[in-house]
């Protein structure tokens, strides 16, 4: 941004487009300066996620998104539940290449911001401190119930995956339910004792 705070350049990503450089000037419409990815994207099958929100069993609203294979919403699809890491991170409005790849291969992909995610206030984020696998797990299972009821999903072909905290939750899920037909845990926490003192984020998540 400029020293007088009247001009700024930035990169912007949308759910269906990779990052491009934009320009903002005070009092003027924002302007896209680059089109680096137009040719590449024109050769790909990109699908836009649909936002949904459901009321959890404790009365709180939980945000989620679902993607379907391009131009294919009438038939039932196998689905993959994606769980983010952190858990102090959050899904939002952006293009996620692995989700697009799975959708292009015929899978529906759904993902939510359960308790423990950032962007919803400290109470939401800290709800899982010392209680991993409790309210967060309930949010994810209730999201799955909601998705299977509302969307054309083949409930006999639903998988789950995630990395880091998402990998921990994948492990937790397969240890507590048989509803998923496949699971892939990535860079996960599988042992809290060995994880203590060896994590790349230090010996504690945050200072209480």
Located regions from the model:
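Short substrate-entry loop that stabilizes the transition state in hydrolases
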Residues: 72-78, 82-121
